[in-house]
Amino acid sequence: MESAGRLDISAGSLNNHQGTVVSDGLSVTLDGALDNTSGRLLSQKTLSVSGSELVSDDGLIQSGSDMTLDVQDGVLSNRNTKTRGGISSAGTLTVRAGMLNNQQGFMVGQKDMTLNAGTLDNRQGVLGSQASLQISSGTLMNQKGALKAGTDMLLSGGDVSNQEGTLAAGRDLNAHLNVLENQQGTVVSNGNSRLDVTRSDNQGGRLVAQQSLTLSSTDIINDASGLIQSGASLNLRADTLSNRNSGDRGGVISQGSMTLNAGTLDSTAGVLLSGDALSLTAGVVNNTSGQVVANGLLGWNSQALNNQSGLIQGKGISINTAGQTLDNRGGTLNSLQELTVSTGAMDNRSG
């Protein structure tokens, strides 16, 4: 089906299996489903599809201007389209679906992209915009997948599974989520990053911002060489922060100042490194065989502090354990200037 001008299609359903629809502008309005399996929908200008379901597996949907795909609470399937062209808009791209399946799929826009889906499955898929990317989803699966924005990225919703996946923003990244599973995954921005999540698991993963990074979570797990890093200031707030076994490549690292607030901090064999001042406020702290280093002043307010075989170092250090015990057996407190320790009891054997 081909039209030199604009083409408007209204029907109960449309079967374009292995077919081709070409027009100068395309609007498809259906009561039911559109089957574009191995088919092609091509528009030189705008393209819009509305219906109850859209299946474009192994297919191509392409527009020279803005594109809107709306299946309401239905399924939009774009699987296995990495080598087929997938869904591509030279303008903005707006998608609404109950379930968006982009497994091993390809979905891109040259301008702003907005996705609203109850469930978004981008496993081993590519989904991106050369401008901003805004995603609202109850469940987002991005294992070994890639979500990329040329400018800002905004994620909101429920659970994000990004194991071995990539979330990348060319400028700022903002996420408001329930759970972020980023084991062996990468979450990176060239600007500022702000993440507000209930639970964050970054074991072996990378949370990196070229500018400031703020992460607020009930539980933060950054074990097994997990890396949380900022090019400017870094702010972490959690009820429980685990930063164990950082190894040579992991830890919590900032080029600028660092602020840590935690109910419980376990940094056994972990690394906390600030390029400037470091302010730490916590309940119980375990820094056994760990390293806490500030290139500026280090202010420490906690309850019991276990620094056995650990290192706490700063340009100047002030430690207050609120009358609790400081266990520094085999540990080191190293201040280039003034060192102040206020504690209930201190064990400094071999320290």
Label for each model-derived stretch:
Residues 1-351:
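A composition-driven surface/loop motif
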